[in-house]
């Protein structure tokens, strides 16, 4: 399974477990897959060996996952330092799980 699909699936599961009224109260609005892919496509991929990415409102990590996939598709040997910030403690476990998934997937031979 690709990174973005994994994050999208887990986000859907989270959305189903958290009532819309509660998400609205918390101000939770998650990026759709198509929007994340579009936003990632706007990023200029260079031939750098290392790149640092900051996601200041990471949510479940959809935007980060889309960008990581794009970067790896352009250069599978690139080193990506991803920093995610999220203040909603209800979303943090999903974000951490997906960040760990990304790390494992990118370290596979």
Give a label for each model feature.
Residues 1-109:
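SAM-dependent methyltransferase catalytic region
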